[in-house]
Design a protein with these regions (language model features):
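Short, flexible segments with low predicted structural confidence
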Residues: 1-3, 33-34
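Short, well-ordered beta-strand segments in beta-rich or mixed alpha/beta enzyme
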Residues: 3-9, 40-68
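Short, surface-exposed ligand-recognition loops at beta-strand->loop->(often short) alpha-helix junctions
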Residues: 10-20
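Non-catalytic surface loops within mature trypsin-like serine protease
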Residues: 11-13, 58, 94-97
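An amphipathic, aromatic/His-enriched active-site/gating alpha helix that lines ligand/cofactor pockets
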Residues: 25-37, 55-91
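Glycine-rich beta-strand-turn "strand-cap" elements at beta-sheet edges
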Residues: 40-50, 76-106
Length: 106
């Protein structure tokens, strides 16, 4: 069953551009890790909560990532604490239903 990991981060006012630039310039080590399906970084339409969504083939794959040297290296240079207004919130969910693929127009 696919596992979706969401990491909610409250970015402080004035730090949004640096935060986004950091994501756009990263190496995306996770993309090559076994079991990862994809990662998305979502910008808030309202408020200050950015959300990083990572989709995994299994919870075990995610746990291998969090215990790996690659994970440690990917998180070695975090933004300064003042870039955030509160601690991040990590949530794990399993997909139990999804819509069929959307029709494409020709």
């Amino acid at each position: 069953m696919v596992l979706v990991v969401s990491n909610r981060m409250s970015v402080a006012k004035g730090w949004e551009e640096d935060f986004e630039r950091g994501w756009n310039q990263r190496k995306w080590t996770v993309a090559q890790f076994p079991g990862v399906i994809r990662t998305e970084v979502l910008r808030p339409v309202r408020g200050d909560h950015y959300v990083v969504m990572t989709y995994w083939k299994s919870k075990e794959d995610f746990e291998r990532w969090t215990g790996s040297q690659a994970h440690i290296e990917a998180h070695a240079n975090p933004p300064p604490k003042e870039a955030f207004t509160s601690p991040n919130k990590l949530e794990l969910h399993e997909i139990i239903a999804e819509s069929p693929p959307m029709a494409t127009s020709t």
